């Protein structure tokens, strides 16, 4: 199975893994009301990575055969949309409240492989 990447390799995106999102929901539920003050909106911490950095991290974790499945086929329409998304957020309030980001893309990939019980060579 191949995956087509619809944006250019240098496209940056803000990332938070599904595991950290679920963790954030649970953490938010467990916070006392006073921790929120009058504003109950918070941007969650995350990391910024380019699509190239994500693919390179996948190669370091899953091997070159995983990278070989990626086909760079940028779609101008999709890229125009994605490039309007913010690439970085300042999240000091969220961090002070105890929310956390993934440390790096490799950790996100390793967690996904473990959570999905993916075995080497499985496609």
Task: List PLM regions with ranges.
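Residue-level detector of short coil/turn "hinge" positions at structural boundaries
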Residues: 66, 101-102
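Short, small-residue-biased leader/transition segments that mark boundaries at the very start
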Residues: 1-3, 51
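Residues at alpha-helix termini
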Residues: 60, 96-98
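Mid/C-terminal beta-alpha module of Rossmann-like enzyme folds, strongest
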Residues: 11, 16, 20-82, 119-122
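Amphipathic terminal alpha-helices
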Residues: 72-74, 86, 91-96, 103-123
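A short glycine-leucine-enriched loop at secondary-structure breakpoints
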Residues: 1, 98-99
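Residues in well-ordered alpha-helical elements
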Residues: 19-22, 52, 92, 102, ...
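Short conserved motifs of the RecA-like P-loop NTPase core
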Residues: 6-9
């Amino acid at each position: 199975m191949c995956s087509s990447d619809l944006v250019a390799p240098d496209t940056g995106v803000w990332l938070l893994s599904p595991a950290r999102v679920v963790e954030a929901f649970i953490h938010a539920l467990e916070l006392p009301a006073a921790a929120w003050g009058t504003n109950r909106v918070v941007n969650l911490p995350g990391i910024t990575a380019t699509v190239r950095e994500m693919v390179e991290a996948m190669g370091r974790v899953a091997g070159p055969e995983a990278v070989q499945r990626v086909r760079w086929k940028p779609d101008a329409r999709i890229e125009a949309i994605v490039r309007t998304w913010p690439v970085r957020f300042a999240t000091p309030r969220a961090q002070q409240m105890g929310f956390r980001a993934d440390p790096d893309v490799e950790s996100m990939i390793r967690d996904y492989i473990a959570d999905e019980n993916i075995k080497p060579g499985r496609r």
